[in-house]
Amino acid sequence: MPEQEPVPPTETTSPESDTPESSDAPAFDPRPILARMPGLPGVYRYFDADGNILYVGKARDLKKRVSSYFNKTQLSPRIAMMVAKIARIDTTVVRTEAEALLLENNLIKALAPRYNILFRDDKSYPFLRLTGHKFPRMAYYRGATDRKHQYFGPFPSAHAVRESMQILQKVFQLRTCEDTVFNNRTRPCLLHQIHRCTGPCVGAISEDDYARDVSNAARFLQGRETEVLEGLQSKMEAHAVQLEFEQAAAVRDQIAALSTVLKRQAVEEVGQARDIDILAVAVQGGRACVNLAMVRGGRHLGDKAYFPAHVDEAAMIVEEGDEADGSAHEGAAADTDQLPIDRIAARVLSAFMVQHYLDQAPPPIVVVSHRPADSALVEALSMQAGRKITLVRQPQGQRKTWLEMAAQGAGLALARRLAEQGSQEARTRALAETIGLDLEDLATLRIECFDISHTAGEATQASCVVFHHHEMQNSEYRRYNIADITPGDDYAAMRQVLTRRYQKLVEQLQEAGGDPAGDGGDGVPRMPRVVLIDGGKGQVEVARQVFEELGLDIGLLVGVAKGEGRKVGLETLVFADGRPSLELGQGSAALMLVAQIRDEAHRFAITGMRARRAKARTTSRLEEIEGVGARRRQKLLTRFGGLRGVMAASIDELASVEGISRTLAEEIYRQLH
């Protein structure tokens, strides 16, 4: 598709935007801005009186679409509730509906409006990487790609990458060790002994033979299995003709291993092998699930489920707006018998595809369970990718099987989520009632929990985990390295982490004009409604002092004190504002949620502390040995590939390193064992 010259969008803002609505201010009058609004493609944004974003929408005809919200006398209760909150309207005019669709979803991802279908940002997808080394290393990789190495994927999950790596290790025996280990190894590792690596580090395989294995592995990952099998067959026969029966047997084992793998996997027929995404949607109980299955080179790599927020409200809003300006997909609009649940699925699918493929181009073929609701979707995705994207609604053969598998996976994942959500919402409600929180929407309850972890004062680290929208928000977790305190002083560690966390937050709120005691507005950092402290009265008192120094509400603070004998279920909630402590009992739903969040904070702190401690010990153990300076330490680490190699070396091997005497080698060995 030829690239279009970008045209600057035209922005319009309602005049009411400069006058926040007060309790006695007149109701918002949309007529002035509607009178000036053009009948052109574009994006509109609704804001409430506090400047919070309510909704972002796109339209083929802005005037018709926006007017429809204010002209209708019969609006659904949820849409009427949103319209009643509107205090400002911003619009952006673009050239085409496809451009409007892309801009709309850029804004949705950036602003996260209350009434839009939202898919949470996830980590970037992982790849399998073959490095550009003379003897390429096979590795799991996540991040930006470059031209120095070969990348295969993306894969839907880390498990899918590691599963493929295990296959390649078994069939082609490629190395997985770090280059520093590879360059300094003097004897083969365990992987060579169990036939999972050909041992290029010690010259057990020639550069040419290893390069052939790498080439075969790359072809396998590209879906060219037949070429690989034919090449191996020819190689085996050539060895047999030369009476090289041992080499022929090794190639025969490769063929057998590869054939076994191919029988287990669902692979598309030769000649049809393509990169394909399969998208299946399930809708139930006001929630939805999009299951994305990835096929690369004709091989099914696995799937991953996504769960959007605000499904009901957003689907209704878009549905009514589409009828006003004719933006609905022609096929969908003509299907008067389409069930409401299918229309919601179509909306969810459209939202997912645009939000998901904004940051990464889709493959040439996307198989879908429902016809997407937006007529401009294919054009927008093709424009974004710079090539034609084909949607397949009714696949045949292996692709049909894959779609059925994805649909079944979506249904099962949604059923699990609904069951979990029911119990989780009940726990959230129980906790809110127990500690006296007055919330209109339980999903807005934001809880931050802190824990301190160390080993006898070494490598002290604090963790902060976040619970919001009835689930843990992994992307918002933070670790804090604690320094300049007496080792083992948990009170000082808690004071330091709380000060660092909330002093910065208060400053950000003040810069943005927000209220530290409030929830923040659009783009403004948000204070939690509850701050859980893993500890009893002493820890809570430290937290109270920090909050008072920062001018924060001490009523947010709740300590989780361990019960008698540290038994689970006997915990007590300790409040900083003078309320009496609460013993909830083992059957308490509120305590279950508190324990879940606290245990997650503890897990997160422990893993960070262990990693930090291991890193510190890796560098410090040799530093502590008298006579081993920086130069000798570097020679030892280079020769043996790291501290583990040094620890595994004998006294004779240590003494063979330049600059290490027999006496010093004995001392090093004694100190490390």
Curated annotation (Swiss-Prot):
Keyword Nucleotide-binding listed: no
Pfam families hit by this protein: GIY-YIG (PF01541), HHH_5 (PF14520), UVR (PF02151), UvrC_RNaseH (PF22920), UvrC_RNaseH_dom (PF08459)
Coiled-coil regions, chain positions: none
All residue ranges annotated as the UVR domain in the record: 226-261
GIY-YIG domain: residues covered: 39-117
GO cellular component, one term: cytoplasm
Start-end of Low complexity biased regions: 10-23
Residue ranges, annotated region (Disordered): 1-32
GO-annotated molecular function: DNA binding; excinuclease ABC activity
Alphabetical list of InterPro entries matching this protein: GIY-YIG_endonuc (IPR000305), GIY-YIG_endonuc_sf (IPR035901), GIY-YIG_UvrC_Cho (IPR047296), RuvA_2-like (IPR010994), UVR_dom (IPR001943), UVR_dom_sf (IPR036876), UvrABC_protein_C (IPR050066), UvrC (IPR004791)
Annotated SMART domains: GIYc
Main localisation: cytoplasm
Listed GO biological process terms: nucleotide-excision repair; SOS response
Record has RNA-binding as a keyword: no
Annotated keywords: Cytoplasm, DNA damage, DNA excision, DNA repair, Excision nuclease, SOS response
Function recorded in the entry: The UvrABC repair system catalyzes the recognition and processing of DNA lesions. UvrC both incises the 5' and 3' sides of the lesion. The N-terminal half is responsible for the 3' incision and the C-terminal half is responsible for the 5' incision.
NCBIfam families, alphabetized: PRK00558.1-5, uvrC
Listed name of the protein: UvrABC system protein C
Organism of provenance: Cupriavidus metallidurans (strain ATCC 43123 / DSM 2839 / NBRC 102507 / CH34) (Ralstonia metallidurans)
Native organism taxonomy: Bacteria, Pseudomonadati, Pseudomonadota, Betaproteobacteria, Burkholderiales
Name of the encoding gene: uvrC
